[in-house]
Amino acid sequence: MANNIKTKITRFGYIVNKNLIDDETIKEIKSDLTVVPFKINNYAPKYIKNEGFPLYVENGNYIGIPKYYGFDKLGEPDIDKVSNYEYPVQDMTYTGTLRPHQQMVSDKIIKGMEEGGGGVLVMGCGSGKTNVAIYIACKFKLRTLFVVHKTFLRDQVIDRIKSNTNVKKVGIIQRKIVNYKHPFVVSMVQSLAKINYNDEIFKDFGMIIIDEVHHMGARNFSTVYQKISSKYMLGISAEYTRTDGMYKIINWYMGPILHLEEQKPNEMVIVKQFYYSTSNKERIKMKYINGDTNKPNRSKMITNLFYIKRRNRFILYLIQELFDMGKNILFLSGRLKQIDLLYELLNNDEFTHGNVGKYIGGMKESSLKKSAMKQIILGSYDMASEGLDIEGLNVVILGTPKTSIKQSVGRILRKEVYEEHPIVIDIVDVDNDTFKKQSKSRNNYFQKQKYNIQKYYISESLKQKYELWNDKEYIKKVLVEIPEIPDKQTQDMIKTNPNPKKKYQGPINIDELNFLEDD
């Protein structure tokens, strides 16, 4: 940097010559950019602060800071090497078709990026964010780095690029694989954060797209911004906040939110809540961390649910009846043992054998694709939290308690027109105060989205106003109950399914199976 140049933008951010900026301003910059995340303590009245970390990098007389923070604090730079660089034009044509609303959003984002160079697109689950981002990249015709944080998302993005553009060879940057001389390159954020690749690899990328960009506020991922930047930066996500208060990191590096639309309310969705009471009081009771009654041990309590035999049987009854109804089912759990158990029981049964697949971390992409074709998919919350795109799903079962379920429910909301009501099965474990509290959070979301909530009460023993857990006729009856369609607009969202329902050939005789413990 020449001695008389105070500021400039490079691929490493907004660079400031400290010798030409007053000490007080430098002090303010360092203070602003030493960020301290908040950690929510669910059982105390205040937030608990974690240790802070810097977003600036010092190198002798120079300090590198986030680009958009630099714009706000110091104004336009003296030199912008990133914008003035002559990026090679790529042969990139979008061959797919955007829906009218997606086209409107794309045009808005393109205009915003032409004016400011970057920003964030926030749209709900199933709205087509990935296709919109690919379309935008093709419009700019610059080599594009698409950053993801999960392997199955990497493969999903590659498939989308190949099926919706003329680009049939997509590069990959991951671990030791560095294949970057293609119009589109997909990279894992973990590799970018941990490995110091040769800087020359990134110089011709005119656009960087970061999927599920809300994760980039995390300390370990935010270091990626200090290594790479480009003329155009686009973040896409269904989220626009972080509970630790670190979303500002994303805006400082990526730019402002250019378009925001939350998940649209959908009166077609039916939530069937089963308020479940168990007789296994030892397994359902509250557990605490180190005996501190202010810190419930949620992890231990969720694990204990797996060992309640009748609760597992009840879930099996639900799955078999939904299968009988011809539903395409996504069962989600926070415990792999529960997934393994259900997979074994269902896949070893002559009637559901071959119709069950797992969808969990560590599986090969070929196995995930095979599982995605099954009528019953048993998956982890982690795999379904973001980006999971399986066509035809119309039922999601929340097998273990969870507070934030927007992404999980979004897996069955990927259509504009529905052949039938999407169904959420929500099991509320009424004998545990922590689980009941989580249920209230889910209810707030369901009500906000105008879902139709139907409540049923199930018990493992005779109890007033409760039905018995193994009353299969009752389960069958309540699963087919649907609310009245409230208005013509909602009626227009549903059309008659001409295909007859698949007939389930017989029940799983789980009463003869001796698995897990009982009370």
Curated annotation (Swiss-Prot):
A Pfam family hit: ResIII
Keyword Nucleotide-binding: yes
Residue ranges of domain Helicase C-terminal in the record: 317-457
Motif annotated as DEAH box, chain positions: 211-214
Leading EC class: hydrolase
Signal peptide, first to last residue: none
Database matches in PROSITE patterns: HELICASE_ATP_BIND_1, HELICASE_CTER
PANTHER family cross-referenced by the UniProt entry: GENERAL TRANSCRIPTION AND DNA REPAIR FACTOR IIH HELICASE SUBUNIT XPB, RAD25/XP-B DNA REPAIR HELICASE
Similarity remark: Belongs to the DEAD box helicase family. DEAH subfamily.
Name recorded for this polypeptide: Putative ATP-dependent RNA helicase L396
Organism of this sequence: Acanthamoeba polyphaga mimivirus (APMV)
